[in-house]
Every structure is written in structure tokens, then in C-alpha cells.
Design a protein with these regions (language model features):
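Amphipathic, Lys/Arg-enriched alpha-helical "gate/interface" segment within cytosolic domains
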Residues: 1-131
């Protein structure tokens, strides 16, 4: 598998759509993965919501805790809310466990449409938010 992340930012909705395709085995893999995110996020220039497709994201168990720590740090300032989606049961289980360890949201939706609806609900529930 080629390690990459595909980004598509909907500026009017302030939603970053990502397609994660990465086999994360080492701390170096985690750092490289989040460096891709940091590079793209630096081009956005505003706080945003994110919908992530996780079917091709593999996080090996022995690196999951470090992944969670870095994920929390990497997104704490700019991310307004996150909804993940995927159909692959192994990817869903692995990411849910990792998110729980990192004390991050761990809901994973079955489709992109469900994830977008979850973001819209988060937007509506955010006090004073027009985002």
C-alpha cells in the first residue's frame, strides 16, 4: 500500500474531507502521517470540521497509544469536530480502540453521508457557531 492522505477542503462548509491510506507501524510512520496533515492544514488558515474515511488506515496495536497522543496534539487547536467513516470492520475496531485510548471521539459511521450528517449536527449544537 502506498502511504498517502488525500485531502479535499470544502471552504464554504468548512469541512476537510480526508481519505487516509497509510500502514502505521512505527513512531516514524506516525510522525510522517501527521506531517502530511500539518502541511495541508497549514494551507487552510481557519478552524474547520473534518470527515475522515478510514478503510485504508492501518494502525498496528503496539503504536496505537503514540498515534493517539500525536493525533490529539495535532488537531487540538484548529479542529472543531471530527466524524470518521468506514466499512472495513478491522479498520473500524482498530481506530475506535485507538481513539478511546487517546480520549478522542470514537464514533465511526458507516457512510460518508452519515459522517457529514454527524458534522452538521455538531455544528448545530455548537454554542454561537455559524461554522
Amino acid at each position: 500500500m502506498d502511504n498517502r492522505v488525500m485531502f479535499d477542503y470544502d471552504r464554504s462548509a468548512k469541512i476537510l474531507f480526508v481519505e487516509d491510506q497509510w500502514d502505521i507501524r512505527t513512531t516514524q510512520d506516525v510522525d510522517a502521517f501527521f506531517a502530511e496533515y500539518a502541511h495541508f492544514i497549514s494551507t487552510i488558515g481557519e478552524k474547520f470540521w473534518m470527515v475522515a474515511h478510514i478503510d485504508k488506515l492501518v494502525i498496528h496495536a503496539d503504536i496505537a497509544e503514540y498515534y493517539g497522543e500525536v493525533a490529539r496534539e495535532a488537531t487540538s487547536e484548529r479542529l472543531l469536530g471530527l466524524a470518521r467513516w468506514g466499512e472495513d470492520s478491522v479498520a473500524r475496531m482498530t481506530l475506535r480502540t485507538t481513539a478511546m485510548k487517546a480520549k478522542m471521539p470514537f464514533d465511526i459511521y458507516s457512510s460518508r453521508e452519515e459522517a457529514v450528517r454527524a458534522i452538521e449536527k455538531m455544528k448545530a449544537e455548537r454554542p454561537g457557531s455559524k461554522a
